[in-house]
From Swiss-Prot:
GO BP term (any one): 'de novo' IMP biosynthetic process
Residues annotated for Mg(2+) 2 binding in this entry: 117, 268
Annotated EC: 6.3.5.3
Gene that this sequence comes from: purL
Residue sites binding substrate per the record: 94-97, 116, 240, 312-314, 533
UniProt xrefs under CDD domains: PurL_repeat1 (cd02203), PurL_repeat2 (cd02204)
Species per Swiss-Prot/TrEMBL record: Rhodopseudomonas palustris (strain ATCC BAA-98 / CGA009)
Protein name: Phosphoribosylformylglycinamidine synthase subunit PurL
Amino acid sequence: MSAPEPKITPELIASHGLKPDEYQRILDLIGREPTFTELGIFSAMWNEHCSYKSSRIHLKGLPTKAPWVLQGPGENAGVIDIGDNQAVVFKMESHNHPSYIEPYQGATTGVGGILRDVFTMGARPIACLNALSFGDPSHPKTRHLVSGVVAGVGGYGNSFGVPTVGGQTRFHTRYDGNILVNAMAVGLADADKIFLAAASGVGMPIVYLGSKTGRDGMGGATMASAEFDEGSDEKRPTVQVGDPFAEKLLLEACLEIMAKDCVIAIQDMGAAGLTCSAVEMGAKGDLGVELDLDAVPTRETGMTAYEMMLSESQERMLMVLKPEKEKEAEEIFKKWGLDFAIVGYTTPTKRFVVKHGGQVKADLPIKELGDEAPLYDRPWVESERLPVIHARDINAPMGAAEALEKLLATPDLCSKRWVWEQYDHVIGGNTVQRPGGDAAVVRIEDGPKGLALTVDVTPRYCEADPFEGGKQAVAEAYRNITAVGGKPLAITDNLNFGNPERPEIMGQLVGCLKGISEACIALDSPIVSGNVSLYNETSGRGILPTPSIGGVGVLDDFTKSATLAFKAEGEAILLIGETKGWLGQSVYLREICGREEGAPPPVDLAVEKRHGDVVRGMIHAGTATAVHDVSDGGLLVAIAEMAIAGNIGASLDAPPGETVSHAWWFGEDQARYVVTVKEADLLAVKTKLKTIGVPCTQIGVTGGHALKIEGERTVDLKALRHAHEHWLPDYMGGKN
């Protein structure tokens, strides 16, 4: 005999993340008090994580279409056509709240979830990336969180067998109580064999595949839609537990079953587990779904309908199967040692019916649960415009050489080798460019084509000016892909913000989205997938607005990709782009001058596109021997990174006479690249750039084992490398 269900009280409703007006909407919708299981289902489907109820109205303005886009937002992942019947499937998603509570398992299941999103579409994953944001290094939890998250990302990806090829890691006190773990996965599929989530046909069997259901992850989606408080550590049981080896089996079984033409629709069980996957399949197909939970494979005894519907146990799929393929599909899954159970059928009723122990535990309208969930147009206010800081009003406390050494040893600009060396970035044998450059390059099967992959955002810009910050995030991803020779094609986004019920936070989201949209249109890079993570606050203190951008580009010939390392001595160093010496919101201003203020650098998207086209053309023509975009830290940091990577020094000219020296070296003006050119090609390159009106300044020549800056002291490469490489290992070892 089953235990009596809890009485529905205001406290129980609030604990499920539902507001009083939302509960009233439920009463009006179904005409009665919901059962406990139904309350849990509404809680899961109407939270921010699943319904996007605060952001959906603004997401509609994003550009999502292009001739090469096969599938835009709304499915498990986006899909773009790269020719030769090849498609790239990719998406980025957050696992922020779980990773703060239990960093290892939170990170592992973040990676596992995004991999499932990709192979659910019929693609074999070929690469992962990530964007990690941690609190101030001096915070007592930061070192523990870094260690756990990095180990979790590496542990899952390495075991599953997909290379982690790139990413971004930052530190700021605003992430002290809410770290961000954004995971991106990229896969390859046949362009004519993409699998979607919408069910079709009445009476079709709904099949549960993969691992058994347990009580881990209970309420995970609801937790991800609420602020943290001092009792957040008590939510540890809501963090899922991942098994990469089971996921690898699930991948192979799914791809095999897809190749046998058994599948009508497929959906992974991610946030809200069985509830969300079943509702989405039915709602997208304008069908009803009836589930019999007695058939669900479980690994714990006595599980209730509520627990089974809201469990977020990992490595599970839901599939609508062609009836005549049932036996064949079951044999495939049994061969891989995975559970296969028919747990329901599609119906014509457009109702979501859940049965357990011979009783109906839920009977709800499926469309209102899914794609007709509540939609809010929350009030928002535009962020205050910050004043422009003029370079001449900023005193340089030290020389450029000393500032460079200090900057290279700061948490944000230091080498992240300690992080990415814990990831297997070459498994599969297709990684052409490893982490540490502007973008990763991955070979596509046995042909000449390659993919350029990157993740980027500058949160301090987004806080200072959300519109410009949103533009810059897309432009930076565009530059990263361009700098290796790739043609940018599309992006995925992961929008991490604070509490949307505060108008100033909602204003940040709206502003960033406007900037992202404008940049995507100007740079011809539609958004094909994404994720929104709100309520990233602890005790009322929000994170920096962090709209992570994952970019994908294609190279027709990966052997002609560029890297940032200096290649030879005696090559000319060119700066492409205009330098006005913009120090507002720069790393130099923060780390050297101790000030976080001012307007961020403006982004001229037409200039970004023009300069990107020029640099890409130089790479393809073979005239650019090394390329690096100028971003955090400015020009001198970019040159130092190129010198360290190539183990070749440089002699640099003094800044132009009219320029403030520290603004020339450390300003973060946009749309700039450092390019090296052989002496034999120099005149032709400079002549061509002058003819087409692209600013180009020769700033030095490669050579030697030091950076020699005219008017400054010489800095040995060994000293620069030590500064760059040692901060993070020393920090993680407790030495600083």
